[in-house]
Amino acid sequence: FNFEDLSRIPDYPNKNFIDSDDIKNLKDGEVYKYWEKSQKIILQNRKAKFLKTHNILGSINGIPFTKPDYTLGVIHIVRDPRNVITSIKNHFDFESYEKAFQYMVSKDAFLKGEDSARFSFLGTWSSHYKSWMSINPQRRITIKYEDMENNTYDTFKRVISYTNKILGIKKDINNDKLLKAISSTSFEKLSLGEKEGKFKENVFNNNNEKIKFFNMGPENKWKNVLPKDIAHKMNNYYKDDLNKLNY
């Protein structure tokens, strides 16, 4: 793995997928108008393309984020919300866990990048994961973040088997390559690479200071990190979701 490889799976949406004339008049929150147009353009070369997104699988003003005709398959990653909150607090530089929690339960939550094309509608944490899990399992694989940490080899082997299936690849999985991929993407190596300036996707706080992306890693365990009142609130608020996801 090299950090340069991250650019091979670009964020969607972003300005590279939208016509330059459309970009000129684009305002925050209006990128949904170009979802379908941009996805039709992506499909023109008839080659499978991997994209990553934070967007909820839903509609804005009657316009769906994507359609089955434009999506070969989905690798959906879900994470315990009690650990998500720590990452959100760090990423947005929130001053308290309470503010991070209010962000997670807001139906109007969004992510905005450096321009109006990089705008993702999130919704609540609960509605977000449910939206992606509504996809037919034949077109989707759902992976728990915790399984990537605790059962790394088998989890990533499942992902490769899934991508091979939807792409029609019949080759056996190369276990040596898989083990090397896992080794080269350990949290320790990714964190070191970020420290050395190899990671290019950091955000900055209000003081223009770079916020660490590979922040806590395996140390982000809610039982050891969250204030008791927030842990209690989240256990109650997400009780049904936690049971559904076996957390």
Give, region by region, the residue ranges found by the protein language model:
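PAPS/PAP-binding and catalytic site of the sulfotransferase fold
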Residues: 1, 142-169, 181, 189-190
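Short, solvent-exposed coil/turn elements at secondary-structure transition points
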Residues: 56, 80, 146-148, 184-187
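An amphipathic alpha-helix signature
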Residues: 82-85, 153-160, 175-179, 231-235
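A generic structural signal for secondary-structure junctions
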Residues: 89-93, 164, 186
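Short, compositionally biased low-complexity segments
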Residues: 153-157, 201-214
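Polar, surface-exposed loop/tail segments
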Residues: 172-186
